[in-house]
A protein has these predicted regions:
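Basic, flexible Lys/Arg- and Gly-enriched helix-loop patches that mediate nucleic-acid binding at interfaces
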Residues: 1-241
Length: 241
């Protein structure tokens, strides 16, 4: 059966649909020897689909990992400059997993890795408004008026943010410690939100995605999601099979 190419790549655990579109655009995908184009349809049972020159097959068993990404680690599976990536931290995992979304190089915390492209696409889809919670250490004292601005939504270069939930944990004259929950996944969003209200982020750690928590997982360590966590996450993002 013919399907859109990005959907096939997602089903085969190559990448989320969004990431698959980028791969097609970058010329990394071919169908029957010809470069793929966005919008192309194919049949996995009939066509020879290659990604980076390697023929893809039907998906292996679905795997879901939780990683506590440390700072100074790239949210990619490879790096031409030899820097540490999340792939270096999941040795022993045979499944071809990929990160769902990203944490920037200087941020740490909860990162989901999976070979379930449909699940990844659902988590990243802006329409799902999946909550993501961060611990934030910022410079200076965050005044109530700026908390209110963040909670109402704030204008960034790429548009207004959805309302955030901000909990002040503790503060001094020099720093503020906050728990911030957002429902989007824009690039460096929390850092940019804080900069817009006049505060630089000193430390940023994601501790929760929807109902999945980092818990006591050590920095640089990973674990497999429990069946209960997988079931709950699938239910929240739209009853994915």
């Amino acid at each position: 059966m013919e399907e859109r190419l990005q959907k096939i790549l997602a089903k085969c655990g190559i990448a989320s649909r969004r990431q698959a579109e980028d791969m097609i655009f970058e010329g990394l995908v071919t169908v029957n020897g010809a470069p793929a184009v966005l919008g192309m349809k194919a049949d996995l049972d009939r066509d020879h689909i290659k990604v980076r020159g390697k023929l893809i097959h039907t998906v292996e068993s679905k795997v879901y990992l939780i990683l506590n990404k440390p700072e100074k680690c790239l949210t990619t599976m490879s790096d031409s400059e030899g820097r540490m990536t999340v792939k270096n931290l999941i040795k022993g995992v045979k499944a071809k997993v990929f990160p769902v979304g990203r944490l920037d190089y200087n941020s740490e915390g909860l990162l989901i890795l999976t070979n379930d492209g449909d699940m990844a696409n659902a988590i990243l889809h802006p329409g799902k408004k999946i909550p993501k919670t961060y611990l934030v250490k910022a410079d200076g004292f965050l005044e109530a008026r700026n908390v209110e601005r963040l909670e109402k939504g704030i204008k960034l270069d790429d548009g207004m943010t959805l309302p955030a939930k901000v909990k002040q944990l503790k503060y001094t004259k020099a720093n503020s410690w906050l728990e911030i929950t957002i429902h989007e996944g824009r690039k460096r969003q929390v850092r940019r939100m804080m900069e817009r209200v006049g505060h630089s982020v000193i430390k940023l750690k994601r501790i929760r995605i929807n109902g999945i928590s980092l818990g006591r997982l050590e920095s640089g360590a990973f674990r497999y999601m429990t069946p209960e966590e997988i079931k709950k996450l699938k239910k929240e993002v739209g009853n994915i099979n």
